[in-house]
């Protein structure tokens, strides 16, 4: 495959990171459900009052990114779901898109811009984590790292596909070629 940062290693690393993203989001969702059911539940990632993931997951910012209830004015709005549930859906869909995309430039662009958005949201949530909640969530920081790595890998894939395949406009400008015809510009 073309490109120094792309190839079989990139494919397996991407699949591994999608699985890690699904696993971290599922773990966060599990902790949130357990904490809602039992206030005395202590999660594995709750080490002290400063390092506590369950306090973050059960805060107002742990559902709907802290934005849905603010915008709709309704805590029980159907979109005001745990952030972890959004993470499970996000990583599952993009992982599926990744497995099915092959050499599609459209899918590579979709993945890249999805991870640009995910990293913007990661910065927003990291700000809330550090400056507003004043705590550290190991699971949250791990998902931020997964998002950053997947952004880098999607950029590599997008760049390698841009080098290998012509755009629609380039193909259109070149014009149709008949079977068996010889293109002097291309073959010399």
What are the roles of these predicted feature ranges?
Residues 1-188:
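Membrane-interfacial helix-loop segments of redox and metal-homeostasis proteins
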């Amino acid at each position: 495959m073309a490109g120094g940062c792309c190839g079989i290693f990139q494919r397996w690393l991407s699949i591994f990171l999608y699985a890690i993203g699904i696993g971290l989001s599922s773990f966060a969702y599990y902790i949130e459900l357990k904490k809602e059911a039992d206030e005395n539940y202590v999660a594995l990632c709750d080490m002290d009052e400063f390092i506590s993931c369950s306090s973050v997951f059960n805060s107002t910012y742990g559902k709907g990114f802290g934005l849905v209830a603010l915008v709709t004015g309704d805590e029980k709005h159907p979109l005001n779901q745990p952030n972890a549930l959004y993470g499970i859906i996000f990583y599952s869909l993009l992982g599926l898109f990744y497995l099915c995309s092959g050499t599609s430039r459209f899918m590579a662009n979709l993945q890249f811009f999805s991870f640009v958005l995910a990293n913007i949201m990661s910065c927003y949530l990291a700000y809330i984590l550090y400056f507003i909640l004043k705590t550290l969530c190991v699971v949250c920081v791990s998902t931020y790292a997964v998002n950053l790595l997947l952004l880098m890998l999607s950029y590599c894939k997008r760049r390698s596909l841009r080098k290998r395949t012509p755009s629609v406009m380039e193909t259109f400008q070149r014009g149709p070629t008949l079977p068996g015809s010889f293109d002097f510009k291309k073959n010399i």
